[in-house]
A protein has these predicted regions:
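Metal-dependent nuclease catalytic cores that hydrolyze phosphodiester bonds in DNA/RNA
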Residues: 1-88, 94-108, 112
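A short mid-domain helix/strand-loop element embedded in enzyme catalytic domains
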Residues: 91, 95, 141-144
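Metal-dependent nuclease catalytic regions and adjoining charged, substrate-binding loops involved
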Residues: 101, 105-115, 120-185
Length: 185
């Protein structure tokens, strides 16, 4: 949903674009991300965070028909200067170039697809939490030197309405969205 090219998302949703066949290197990179996520959750627990719904126990959050997302965890206590819980947890690993762009521009400007993901995870319906989530702790780890970036992402209901409109157009739309770019990269 957060991909800037809605045409690509529209086609992928309908299985009308080539299915990416991930090879060994990419599968290992995915595995690195999963392992680093587990390590970060352990680190957060060790400094006093109450974090749950991690790993294989992630919450399943429905934001629209056929659109589900899963935060990497839910924090119930431990973040300095945060009074309202629960707080979603989202973590990514990045190469140096993407990490430094994130540091300079923040999540929304450097990785809008991750910002959109965080918004969706705060908005959607789930059966486990009894209260709404109003922010997300986004953490990125630089794969080159293990630097950590952290940012609190506040829920943005007006922006979420735009995401939902995109989701409805992708799921229920009958016409192909405009091209984002003719550049294949």
């Amino acid at each position: 949903i957060g991909c800037p090219c809605q045409r690509s998302t529209f086609l992928s949703f309908r299985w009308a674009s080539p299915i990416e066949d991930f090879k060994g290197q990419m599968l290992r990179l995915f595995d690195v991300g999963t392992r680093e996520e587990d390590i970060m959750v352990d680190n957060l627990k060790n400094i006093g965070f109450d974090i749950r719904y991690t790993g294989k126990d992630q919450l399943k959050i429905q934001i629209a028909p056929h659109v589900i997302c899963r935060p990497d965890g839910v924090i119930f206590d431990g973040i300095p200067d945060i009074d309202e819980y629960p707080v979603n947890f989202e973590m990514k690993t990045m190469n140096r170039s993407n990490f430094e762009k994130l540091e300079k521009q923040g999540l929304r400007n450097s990785k809008p697809e991750y910002y959109d993901q965080a918004q969706c995870e705060m908005y959607g319906e789930n059966t486990e939490l009894e209260t709404e989530v109003k922010c997300t702790l986004f953490v990125a780890l630089c794969k080159d030197d293990s630097r950590i970036y952290a940012e609190i992402i506040d829920a943005n209901p007006d922006y979420m309405e735009l995401i939902l409109k995109r989701a409805r157009n992708i799921v229920f739309g009958n016409s192909l969205p405009e091209e984002y770019s003719i550049d294949p990269e």
